[in-house]
Amino acid sequence: MARALVLLSVVLVSLLVNQGRASDNQRLFNNAVIRVQHLHQLAAKMINDFEDSLLPEERRQLSKIFPLSFCNSDYIEAPTGKDETQKSSMLKLLRVSFRLIESWEFPSQTLSGTVSNSLTVGNPNQITEKLADLKMGISVLIQACLDGQPNMDDNDSLPLPFEEFYLTMGDNSLRESFRLLACFKKDMHKVETYLRVANCRRSLDSNCTL
């Protein structure tokens, strides 16, 4: 009888601990979604402010660049389209999101310089800090998803493709400045989508349609 009571106590404690972890992970997921939403909205505002600051001739030049044909993040293997995203596991979506956020830690410093003269985007230097915080949160979610298993994602060891390209951004040309802003917006939209679907994956009864 005593042994049964001890066993029951252990089971109850384990359940409470697991419930606490699940609650913490849910809060972390919600915070991650909110943070990347803010970054996506900030990216959209930066592009609008950038375009508003241009002369008519410069805007005509931009019309020749858009739609955007290439971003350096295209090197990162990621789900494309709604169907592939919805079929991806929560762990895969978290890993891709981590990779995309990580890839912007260095170029976000150039991004800050691109919009440093804007008075409406707040302090652009905070973008790098926001990315670092989001990266840390996603890393914790990945570890929780692995539940003690080793991380076997080969892509984690691949070099990031951004650093050399953005070293050429020193001339701050119109084309490259716009490309940088547009790519940042594109990638933040990706991460927002992936995190939303990954968060939805936590509930088996949820309809995770996009």
Curated annotation (Swiss-Prot):
Entries under Pfam families matching the protein: Hormone_1
Disulfide links within the chain: C71-C183, C200-C208
Keyword match Zinc: yes
InterPro entries on file: 4_helix_cytokine-like_core, Somatotropin, Somatotropin/Prolactin, Somatotropin_CS
GO cellular component, one term: extracellular space
Functional note: Growth hormone plays an important role in growth control and is involved in the regulation of several anabolic processes. Implicated as an osmoregulatory substance important for seawater adaptation.
Alphabetical list of PANTHER family matching this protein: SOMATOTROPIN, SOMATOTROPIN,PROLACTIN
Listed name of the protein: Somatotropin-1
Organism: Carassius auratus
